Amino acid sequence: GKIATGDLFVGDSATKAAIEAKCAPDCVEMEGAAVSQIAAKNGVPCVILRAMSDNADEDGHEVLVVKKFSIGEYVATATKIVAAMVEAL
């Protein structure tokens, strides 16, 4: 899917709506494009794997702080995803 990237945390509905109107992304994030750009500039292969942690709205900061999750479940899911990516290569 399409990912928008930028240099600020999207923490309100107005900013979210503006981004959606501009490029209709499936999600937004802050670091992936920068990492990919530097890797490409230096000839280093790069894959970005992200976990979405909030809804990019007024409750975004709260979700990051109060959401409980099982680290075991996270690791198991991430392992399956990465293994499938490696097999596809």
What spans do the regions from the language model cover?
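Glycine-rich phosphate- or other oxyanion-binding loops that anchor nucleotides, phosphorylated ligands
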Residues: 1-89
